[in-house]
Amino acid sequence: MYIKTLMAAAVVSVLAVSGARAELVTQSLPKPDMVGGKTLMQSLQERKSVREFGRLAVNDQTLADMLWAAVGVNRQDGKRTIPTALNSQDLTVYVLKFDGVWQYDARGHKLIQVSDKDLRPLLGTQDYAKDAALDLVYVSTSDVATNGAMHAGSAYQNVGLYCADKGLNN
């Protein structure tokens, strides 16, 4: 866990340096698809980690649904799909893809490009990790280290269940 935290911190540091862009690039996401899907128990049964990924890009609807599952706003009062200690909502999700690094704006349900560089190779040393179409990096601004880890774990689990529901490897 410590190594992964250091790697994520390194990626975020690179983002801070490389993120200075002349113009702000945003990408609106489609509304989350709330229809259909497997039962929770089926998704739990099928949830697993794998070491094989296709090189196909993830379409916008799938990415929108995945990010909404991670930390999306699911109530009128602005609360999220994951619980956060004292409703701190201190977790930010970054999407690393071939076309750069994008920050997920949960309130606006959109992506904001923070770098146009493909930083995915910085995340993993295993060969299989390089084949993933995208990586999600969870960054917490919580002053309490355990809260950030707890929030990231909740978001990660939601994404895992979403992927199981859709038959996606994660």
Features from the language model and the residues they span:
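Bacterial N-terminal signal peptides
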Residues: 8-16
